[in-house]
Amino acid sequence: MELIKKSNDAETPEVKKSFLEDVLSKRIKSTDNIKQNEYLLKIDNTNKFSKGNISGWIGLAKSKKTFALTMFVAALVGHLKLYAKFNANTKANVLYIDTEQSPSDVQRITQRVKKMVGNEEGLFMYGLRPLSPKLRIEAIELLLKEHKTTDVLIIDGVRDLLMDINNAVESTEVMTLLMKWSFDYDIHIATVLHQNKNGGDSRGHIGTELNNKAETILRITKDETDGSISHIEEVFGRGKGFDKFSFQVSDDGLPEVLSEYSITTDIDAPF
């Protein structure tokens, strides 16, 4: 991939001077007027998921990671307070990339969001399963340029941007690219990654990089006694955390938090 630029002794003095000026421009002083983090959503009353940062959603296979993410997406595109757990601070546009599932399975995610919100405005869903890792990366960059109003990029299957999740160099390059995208496009990037079967860690070197660089890591686990119930908890995070909570899939096929709360919204409800 060679995303990391290597030194070239043949570079002209003009090129080196230009790079030095770019580096010096990145100095941060206490008196600088710097834009503060823009948080897109609260869990409970705790701000999470800011633009310019990355989150990780991890869990074993079939733990309902995508269902958990569906609540996140519905709250954002609908500007909802969903079960008083996923509380959007603003209406957001979401570019959702799925790398694992068939077109019909990807469509079902869109249909669930539409049922929860009332429409699918602001949700741009793409299934990139047929592409190679390199072409998936190229496709995502093209889509970010196409959907210029994107606030959140979701990569459901970030390991599919790599040939080998245990390759340290490749993992560092992909994570470096994600950080660059989050900065260049001023977006939040939510990544989904499988968890190791023998422990609670994210899989591979890409998982280690994600743990080190992410603003927050959420783990989704299936209940040990009732397989219809899953739990969401924060295992790593900056700032204040939130209490673990549970959800299940209703008879209508929609995820719902297990509590006494119902859906409310800061804007006129679409239903």
Predicted regions and their residues:
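Short, small/acidic-rich helices and loops at N termini and domain boundaries
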Residues: 1-17
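The Walker A/P-loop phosphate-binding site
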Residues: 12-113
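Conserved catalytic network of the ASCE P-loop NTPase/AAA+ motor domain
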Residues: 49, 86-89, 117-118, 145-147, ...
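Phosphate-binding/switch region of NTP-binding enzymes
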Residues: 56-62, 67, 172-263
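Conserved inter-motif catalytic segment of the P-loop NTP-binding fold
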Residues: 60, 89-173, 249-254, 259-266
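Conserved, well-folded catalytic cores of nucleic-acid-processing
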Residues: 75-79, 113-116, 161-164, 181, ...
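Acidic, gly/ser/pro-rich intrinsically disordered tails
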Residues: 267-271
